[in-house]
From Swiss-Prot:
Cofactor binding note: Binds 1 Mg(2+) ion per subunit. The magnesium is bound as Mg-PRPP.
Names of required cofactors: Mg(2+)
Job description of the protein: Catalyzes the conversion of uracil and 5-phospho-alpha-D-ribose 1-diphosphate (PRPP) to UMP and diphosphate.
Top-level class of the enzyme under EC nomenclature: transferase
Pfam families: UPRTase (PF14681)
Regulation: Allosterically activated by GTP.
Gene3D superfamilies per UniProt: 3.40.50.2020
Signal sequence, renumbered to the chain: none
Keyword set, alphabetical order: Allosteric enzyme, Glycosyltransferase, GTP-binding, Magnesium, Nucleotide-binding, Transferase
Gene name of the encoded protein: upp
GO MF term set: GTP binding; magnesium ion binding; uracil phosphoribosyltransferase activity
Protein's name in the database: Uracil phosphoribosyltransferase
Positions of 5-phospho-alpha-D-ribose 1-diphosphate binding: 79, 104, 131-139, 200
Amino acid sequence: MKNLVVVDHPLIKHKLTIMRDKNTGPKEFRELLKEITLLLAYEATRHLKCEEVEVETPITKTTGYRINDKDIVVVPILRAGLVMADGILELLPNASVGHIGIYRDPETLRAVEYYAKLPPLDGDKEVFLLDPMLATGVSSVKALDILKENGARKITLVALIAAPEGVEAVEEKHSDVKIYVAALDERLNDHGYIIPGLGDAGDRLFRTK
């Protein structure tokens, strides 16, 4: 798992534990997902380049640094990825936002695309793909396929929890993509859910079950 970075931080561990609790309600669950995404983004954006700018303080002029976040694209996988987008956009408010709709067929576990709306993607854009649960990896692999078909070349995948199977699937198909997660869990069960995981993130966010 050469491309995997598990962001080891006490705040992330604390907040993720609350999210795992089956008794945590949707309001708190949403807030925690947004907060953890913000913390993950701190590390996932570490490679971004800064340009020097001159700034005038109340005392004197000095050299500062600026990220051109207009060259950044945030792409959540619907629907649970939407909340993650809110977190990263607090740090990068001028980033463009695309959306990819993919669901995993419960019988075949294959990824099915039902929606894609993306801003212009060229090789210079820094793209952050957001997928809360990297389980089998089929949804993330499909989304990465779509992004690259549309011209993206610099892509970082940010997930809340990953299973080893999902990480391996992404690395096999997209070895150039770095993966940042809050936790690497044990395995998948027979239904393709992460163990111990936190259940279906989308259902818990939107109370659809």
